[in-house]
From Swiss-Prot:
Recorded GO CC terms: extracellular region
UniProt function note: Insecticidal, cytolytic and antimicrobial peptide. Has insecticidal activity against the flesh fly S.carnaria. Has antibacterial activity against the Gram-negative bacteria E.coli. Forms voltage-dependent, ion-permeable channels in membranes. At high concentration causes cell membrane lysis.
Record note on modification: Cleavage of the propeptide depends on the processing quadruplet motif (XXXR, with at least one of X being E).
Entry's family note: Belongs to the cationic peptide 06 (cytoinsectotoxin) family.
Domains: entry comment: Both the N-terminus (61-94) and the C-terminus (99-129) of the mature peptide form alpha-helices which probably disrupt target cell membranes. The linker region (95-98) probably derives from a processing quadruplet motif (PQM), found in propeptides of many zodatoxins, hinting at a fusion of two originally separate membrane-active peptides.
MF-aspect GO terms: toxin activity
Name of the protein in question: M-zodatoxin-Lt8g
Designated gene of the protein: cit 1-8
Propeptide span(s): 21-60
SS bond list: none
Superkingdom as given in the UniProt entry: Eukaryota
Endpoints of the signal sequence: 1-20
Tissue expression from the record: Expressed by the venom gland.
Coiled coil location: none
Length: 129
C-alpha cells in the first residue's frame, strides 16, 4: 500500500511537470529582438538568458515522454485493479466486471480504485485504534 501511495505521488509530480507551460523558443526570441530593436546591454543579457531556456524545452520533452509512459502503465494497472475489486466486491464474473470497467472513463476508474483503497486504509487505521 505504501508503494502504491508513493507511485501516485510520483505520477502527480510528473503530471505537474508535463502540464507546465513550454519555454519560449529561439525563433520567438529573434522576433522579440527584431520588434523591440534592442540595443541596451540589459536587454541583451535578458535575451541571452531566455536563449538558455531552449535546454529546458529538451528536458521538459524528456519528462513529458516519461510522464506519458508512466501514466499509460498506471492506467493499465488501475484498470486491472478495478476489475479485481469489482469481482471481489460485487461477486460478478470477470467478464462482466471487465465490461463494466470498459464502460467507465479513465477518471472514473482512478476514482473507483482510489476510493476502494482509501476505505481499506481507513478501516485498517481504525482497527489499530
Amino acid at each position: 500500500m505504501k508503494y502504491f501511495v508513493v507511485a501516485l505521488a510520483l505520477v502527480a509530480a510528473f503530471a505537474c511537470i508535463a502540464e507546465s507551460k513550454p519555454a519560449e523558443s529561439e525563433h520567438e526570441l529573434a522576433e522579440v529582438e527584431e520588434e523591440n530593436e534592442l540595443a541596451d546591454l540589459e536587454d541583451a543579457v535578458w535575451l541571452e538568458h531566455l536563449a538558455d531556456l531552449s535546454d529546458l524545452e529538451e528536458a521538459r520533452g524528456f519528462f513529458g515522454n516519461t510522464w506519458k509512459k508512466i501514466k499509460g502503465k498506471a492506467d493499465k494497472i488501475m484498470l486491472k485493479k478495478a476489475v479485481k475489486i469489482m469481482v471481489k466486491k460485487e461477486g460478478i464474473s470477470k467478464e462482466e466486471a471487465q465490461a463494466k470497467v470498459d464502460a467507465m472513463s479513465k477518471k472514473q476508474i482512478r476514482l473507483y480504485v482510489l476510493k476502494h483503497y482509501g476505505k481499506k486504509a481507513l478501516q485498517k487505521a481504525s482497527e489499530k485504534l
